[in-house]
Amino acid sequence: NTNNTIEEQLSTLEKYSQGRLGVALINTEDNSQITYRGEERFAMASTSKVMAVAAILKESEKQAGLLDKNIIITKSDLVAYSPITEKHLATGMSLAQLSAATLQYSDNTAMNKILDYLGGPSKVTQFARSINDVTYRLDRKEPELNTAIHGDPRDTTSPIAMAKSLQALTLGDALGQSQRQQLVTWLKGNTTGDHSIKAGLPKHWIVGDKTGSGDYGTTNDIAVIWPKNHAPLILVVYFTQQEQDAKYRKDIIVKATEIVTKEFSNTSQKK
């Protein structure tokens, strides 16, 4: 049973990493799953942003022109790591621009502006419940949601819950068709993911992803993947460590990706 050997390989990787690793892969061809600590809670860090943007997209189904709505950004709004919003203090940004900045550059002020518009982090949790995700919980804004304290349930989910939600949002019918296409387009245009899941996959595969990082060396990535000649895959890799100031370990994300996707790169080469 290859599943066992995959789990054994992930366990070996985790021991080597000296951290805690969570993985969930869904093969959408038959909805089969590979998981490792798939039901355990991990701090999401910026991977939480996909659900927040999806909540805005859902609102836009009911309100024509919502994404064009201009949001004022003041100097006092700015929080650490806001490469796009800091350039738009004079003009403000539309909800569409804020969504793109949130997903493609992981701009923290943009995320906070989206949360403010929705009515706070709890509204994102409510949206998650509405798409049948009972695990996801968003409790705080940026940058506080990245504290990733061991055992703290705030701003966490499980790998399998996130994988199922990402599948519903990008490939299922949790969003209307044009909203789903917009989300996928934004994810495919991500600028932060080249050294994470993408680096563990064959070059010609198409990937849309959202990275995340936080305290305790928390290093995350969630992705929808289109292999050559194969139905899409959904992959969530969450990783966290013992020391609060531990270094990020994108190499662990890459290795975990290689382990769980190997069988698909083999089939796509054969065809």
From Swiss-Prot:
Pfam families (UniProt xref): Beta-lactamase2
Broad enzyme group: hydrolase
Keyword Hydrolase: yes
Keyword presence, Hydrolase: yes
InterPro entries assigned: Beta-lactam/transpept-like, Beta-lactam_cat, Beta-lactam_class-A, Beta-lactam_class-A_AS
Enzyme nomenclature, EC number: 3.5.2.6
Active site: S46 (acyl-ester intermediate)
UniProt binding sites for substrate: K210, T211, G212
Keyword field: Antibiotic resistance, Hydrolase
Swiss-Prot/TrEMBL catalytic activity: a beta-lactam + H2O = a substituted beta-amino acid
Molecular function terms, GO-annotated: beta-lactamase activity
GO biological-process terms attached to the record: beta-lactam antibiotic catabolic process; response to antibiotic
Function: Hydrolyzes broad-spectrum beta-lactam antibiotics. Active against cephalosporins.
Additional free-text comment from the UniProt record: The class A beta-lactamase family has a specific amino-acid numbering system, sometimes called Ambler or ABL numbering and often misspelt as Amber. A multiple sequence alignment was used to derive a consensus sequence and then the consensus was numbered taking into account insertions and deletions. This allows use of identical numbers, e.g. for active site residues, despite differences in protein length. UniProt always uses natural numbering of residues, hence there appear to be differences in numbering between this entry and some papers.
Complexes and interactors: Monomer.
Record family assignment: Belongs to the class-A beta-lactamase family.
Name used for this protein in its record: Beta-lactamase
Lineage: Bacteria, Pseudomonadati, Pseudomonadota, Gammaproteobacteria, Enterobacterales
